[in-house]
Amino acid sequence: MVRYYDPETTSEEDVRPRERTRSPAQRQALMRERNAALEGKAAFDAAKEVALRQLDVRARSQHELESTMTSRGFSSETAREVIKRLAELGLVDDLAFARAFARGRFEAGGKTGSALKMDLSRKGLSSQIIAQVLSEIDADEEYSRAHALAEKKMRSLTVHDRQVIRRRLFSMLARKGYAPQVCIRVIDELLESEDCDEL
């Protein structure tokens, strides 16, 4: 915005150059300094506010919350205290988070097995929780999801060479974490049903 001054009514002292606004990096550095300077209850309350705002957006793992609070300048001790308190209140539960996250990834993207395990470990979840959540996925449900994904992919393929189709379907299912025996079974059934349709 341009500011116009009347030279007859405005003195030079009144005309100051506009202060430069801080860049996002400068604002973040200033915020980290302020948060690091906080102590005791003030630090706990400010860190808790950060965690609650994060939880307002979506459920988070304890690791994600701790990373967010420490990246904002709070000590890891303060972050752990806040997480402990939120866990006591039932607002943070890694097992419930892992179940919901895995269910969402499985239903929306069809991920399972090693691909889902990798996604869960990125969230900072323990190997025990990951193993428990992965064991809860039903084999029949996994097979039907793999079948649906492969069927959808097969419709989009324009090639007619069976080996190319087999390779592309197998690699797509393997990237999503399906076991080789599931991939082979699904692909064989799809190719067999396609052969029957052509007769």
PLM feature spans:
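An alpha-helical, amphipathic repeat domain used for nucleic-acid recognition
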Residues: M1-L199
